[in-house]
Amino acid sequence: MPETNRLSEPTEWIDLEFVERQRTPEFAIQVGIQLYLAGLSLSNTKQYLERLGVKRSRTAIHDWVRKADLQPDCDVSPNQIAVDETVIRVNGQRHWLYAAVDAETNQFLHVRLFQTRTTQLTVLFLRELREKQQLSDTTFLIDDAAHLKAALDRLGLRFRVSRHGNRNSVERVFREVKRRTSSFSNTFSNARLPTVDSWLKAFAVWSNRCQS
């Protein structure tokens, strides 16, 4: 089980302040979150914890990830940020995943899931990113989508249309996200937008850990 190889890594990136009772040992919560985000299914994560003497349901493990409220962040101001969106399906329905990725490091800076794609929602996504990042010296790398250009223009942010080179960083991370979300309908019962959005943010944090 190669995913377990990362269990020796520091876990300071997992804030356990959400743990209200000591019914579950903190180490078990950390292990469960790590394994699930690393690629194990909820069922396999549950089985691994049982071998450690901790019996918890799949729902409990999923709730740990949700309650941890992991959010991607970055201390540096990237020179170039690749921004794009892609369709993922949850319970058979189309949703739009927006992502901003440091074009040099492939690290997620911000992710957000929407039920549709509009210029106004793109503006909202970029405003949320601007609250987290200093963007005055940043150039955004985008495709030729009209809503992306309109939103960046509206916010006075510098951008360049680019279909190759560093903009491909966002395509690479999208491939992994799609691989993981393809099983959502089999993993979550009646998955809702906030549920999937919180998982995506947690996955972004995990992905950034793998890049560092």
Q: Which residue stretches match the model-derived regions?
A:
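Two-metal-ion RNase H-like nuclease active-site motif
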Residues: 77-90, 99-101
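Active-site beta-loop-alpha junctions of metal-dependent nucleic acid enzymes
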Residues: 111-135
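Major-groove recognition helix of helix-turn-helix-like DNA-binding domains
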Residues: 54-69
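Acidic/histidine-rich, metal-coordinating catalytic segments
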Residues: 136-148
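Charged alpha-helix within mobile-element recombinases
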Residues: 174-212
